Amino acid sequence: MKPSVILYKALPDDLLQRLQEHFTVHQVANLSPQTVEQNAAIFAEAEGLLGSNENVNAALLEKMPKLRATSTISVGYDNFDVDALTARKILLMHTPTVLTETVADTLMALVLSTARRVVEVAERVKAGEWTASIGPDWYGTDVHHKTLGIVGMGRIGMALAQRAHFGFNMPILYNARRHHKEAEERFNARYCDLDTLLQESDFVCLILPLTDETHHLFGAEQFAKMKSSAIFINAGRGPVVDENALIAALQKGEIHAAGLDVFEQEPLSVDSPLLSMANVVAVPHIGSATHETRYGMAACAVDNLIDALQGKVEKNCVNPHVAD
């Protein structure tokens, strides 16, 4: 008999078929307490779990005594209780490599669209305000040869640095847990402490996961240290930034603009002050949202679950020691 798994995110037909070749697949809409209660017998027998954008916590795991592996269609896993999973010897798989280039594209798009005010001036054109040759009130700022500060020099940070260095001749500063020799050799990137990065960068790009240590890492103190002409970009995790402090910094003119793909609460509230600011480009967590990349992530997650339930945890496993 095939192992039973629960799928809580729709998959393309070919990937669903691949999953069904290995498992008995039960599809549910979400992982809410009501859904779990209504499908208690299925959850009690499931050995695998696959999906995204749902919380997997100790309360859910209590309902899934046979669970051996869970696979998320994402690189981030802050909605998973890793300690609870590990304590129960449940493997957690994710998709860290598939989306690197696409998220770096999104970051570069935010850099360009904020600096050149693309969204703002496009809306002005649509509103019929372009009635003569444009003047300084339509101008943006240059990107080329400006200093880019990257906070978090992982795979995505490296891909962003490549674009900025070779495509836009931007000097690169970075702050990370350790020196990154490859970044320094390939892009002439300079490691510095966070305060120095904030003070010297024209663009500050935040690419950090959410952990206890990074929660609200950026607040009023950090924004006050940035140039008044600086542009802040976040495509990591929303709660790494104190959003109220960001709003205040923008309102007071402590920073020039912001390009945001992530927020403390998602979806972003329609009454958020960020949405009324012309110097803010706010997009709905589109970092990896292309047809090609989202398919690749789903395919990777399917393969990850197959591997995990076969005891193969050489790659893409958050807690591989569980398999020891």
From Swiss-Prot:
It comes from Escherichia coli (strain K12). It is found in: Cytoplasm. Catalyzes the NADPH-dependent reduction of glyoxylate and hydroxypyruvate into glycolate and glycerate, respectively. Can also reduce 2,5-diketo-D-gluconate (25DKG) to 5-keto-D-gluconate (5KDG), 2-keto-D-gluconate (2KDG) to D-gluconate, and 2-keto-L-gulonate (2KLG) to L-idonate (IA), but it is not its physiological function. Inactive towards 2-oxoglutarate, oxaloacetate, pyruvate, 5-keto-D-gluconate, D-fructose and L-sorbose. Activity with NAD is very low. Keywords: Cytoplasm, Gluconate utilization, NAD, NADP, Oxidoreductase. Induction: Constitutively expressed. HAMAP family: 2_Hacid_dh_C_GhrB. SUPFAM superfamilies: Formate/glycerate dehydrogenase catalytic domain-like, NAD(P)-binding Rossmann-fold domains. Belongs to the D-isomer specific 2-hydroxyacid dehydrogenase family. GhrB subfamily. It holds the Pfam family 2-Hacid_dh. This is Glyoxylate/hydroxypyruvate reductase B. GO terms for molecular function: gluconate 2-dehydrogenase activity; glyoxylate reductase (NADPH) activity; hydroxypyruvate reductase (NADH) activity; hydroxypyruvate reductase (NADPH) activity; hydroxypyruvate reductase [NAD(P)H] activity; NAD binding. Gene3D superfamilies: NAD(P)-binding Rossmann-like Domain. The active site is at 237, 266, 285 (proton donor). GO terms for biological process: D-gluconate metabolic process; ketogluconate catabolic process. GO terms for cellular component: cytosol; plasma membrane. InterPro entries: D-isomer_2-hydroxyacid_DH, D-isomer_2_OHA_DH_cat_dom, D-isomer_DH_CS, D-isomer_DH_NAD-bd, Glyo/OHPyrv_Rdtase_B, NAD(P)-bd_dom_sf. Homodimer. Optimum pH is 7.5. It catalyses: glycolate + NADP(+) = glyoxylate + NADPH + H(+); (R)-glycerate + NAD(+) = 3-hydroxypyruvate + NADH + H(+); (R)-glycerate + NADP(+) = 3-hydroxypyruvate + NADPH + H(+); D-gluconate + NADP(+) = 2-dehydro-D-gluconate + NADPH + H(+).
